């Protein structure tokens, strides 16, 4: 062997290794380069642009079909939806939305929310509730337990205290029945006709000594003089009535009467009948006039201010904060039951809406050949480096075999 021709034996494995190592990069570049068609004398040069840029639309369709047929099948999408919509994740999302809504109300305090809540309250009390009451009030047992409870616990046990009875007695004697009012009542009562009836009745129905007095003297003159005195001597009459009120202890008698006034002192049968009458009266009132009452109440209430107060109270209420987790958990369970039953149908309906295949096609078509080339080269360098190395090894081995054959051919 002529060692002066050593390069003939060394070059095949070296060149084979180099070619094998860089073949992948060269092949990738040949697939993409050139990016644009090249024209000479108005005619397109063959193999321009590269294979992938020239068939990018068809490549996009094939990639979309491959992904949708092998990777993103309906079953895989259902599994993906199940993992995404796990109860814990759904609960966390709902809880986040509820807290976000509360925070939004806290930060904005806007009039729009107040108007919405005010409209709901106005419709509930002014429209929905009256219609509901009118229907429910037709039932014989409507509010029976509630009215009986109010009657037994409040009305039946209600009794004026000593101070309340004293003030009520003072009000009756000073405002309702003052001396001047009593004097005028006496004058109005003692008409000529009334005096005649009293006198005749006294004469006819008395006997013994009273008969003698009635027929000799009678009551006509006495009652007439009393009426005349009340008309002519108003101040004196008022003073006399005031003295009689004090001497007869009318104030104290009224106070004791009012203080002892209680439904518990009535017979049991009367109490039961009164309770039944109260219940029927309330039911008939709600049935006949409840709608008008609620409508008038609705018109007189400033619902926007109430809505603002309600929103402020809810935003700072600890009950609302603690109940958000319970609400989110219950809503998540309801959604989980619904998805468990209809997830397949939902996914089947969602696939055409999402148009995942068209998204893939549009994305591949809109990506420039240079970006596609860079992406594939990145995958080869990061994930397929072993193939590149293996290409270099195979090239080196093939070149080495050529050297062996060359050496053997010398002998």
Swiss-Prot record:
Tell me which Pfam families the record gives. DUF445 (PF04286)
Please indicate which superkingdom the organism of origin belongs to. Bacteria
Going by the UniProt record, its keywords in alphabetical order are:
Cell inner membrane, Cell membrane, Membrane, Transmembrane, Transmembrane helix
Please list every transmembrane segment annotated in the UniProt record, as residue ranges.
3-23, 387-407
Q: Does the keyword Transmembrane helix apply?
A: yes
Main location per the UniProt record: membrane
Q: Where in the cell is it found?
A: Cell inner membrane
Record bears the keyword Cell inner membrane: yes
Question: Which family, according to UniProt?
Answer: Belongs to the UPF0754 family.
Which protein are we looking at?
UPF0754 membrane protein Npun_R4433
Organism name: Nostoc punctiforme (strain ATCC 29133 / PCC 73102)
Q: What is the lineage of its organism?
A: Bacteria, Bacillati, Cyanobacteriota, Cyanophyceae, Nostocales
